[in-house]
Regions:
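Short, glycine/charge-rich beta-strand/loop segments that flank catalytic centers
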Residues: 74-84, 101-108, 130-137
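Short beta-strands and strand-loop turn motifs
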Residues: 98-101, 152-153
Length: 157
């Protein structure tokens, strides 16, 4: 089994893990847009890829998978997940399975507001969340919300 780890970056430990598990039954291929990726040192094969949002990224990966008989693709970077998920069928057409959730699930996980609504709509406890700072200030002013509060961007950390 040949495995391609995308956006491998500094995750050399993941490359080592897959090499150990695969043993002699396949190769670990890695790609990253930065040629200084430390993980390149540990892979069986390495390639510099276009950036994730580059229009050539998916065609590049599909062609690479086809040429190297890649069986599965696993991304090691959350930003890559949605891009790969939207193109799963194209990879399957060349015999490659992308190990990734469905796009709608990734969209919920990547968006704190969608995550909050999903949790609330499905009966889970979730901290109050607001889209606008004005809403928070108004709630504090009328005593419906008090400090401490946590303010985070909708996307990212």
């Amino acid at each position: 089994m040949n495995v391609l780890l995308t956006s491998v970056g500094r995750r050399a430990y993941m490359v080592k893990y897959f090499k150990e598990v695969l043993g002699n039954s396949g190769k670990v291929y890695v790609c990253n847009s930065d040629d200084k990726s430390i993980a390149f040192k540990y892979a069986d094969e390495k390639v510099i890829s276009p950036l994730i949002y580059d229009k050539n990224y998916i065609p590049f990966l599909i062609d690479y998978c086809k040429k190297n008989a890649i069986d599965i693709v696993i991304s090691l970077f959350d930003i890559d997940l949605l891009v790969l998920a939207r193109h799963k069928k194209e990879f399957e057409e060349v015999g490659t399975k992308v190990i990734v959730s469905e796009p709608q699930i990734i969209e919920v996980c990547n968006d704190k507001w969608k995550t909050y609504n999903f949790l609330r709509d499905n009966g889970f406890n979730a901290p109050l969340s607001f889209l606008k700072m004005d809403e928070i200030i108004d709630k504090i002013a009328v005593g419906e919300l008090s400090y401490p509060i946590v303010v985070k961007p909708r996307y990212g950390c």
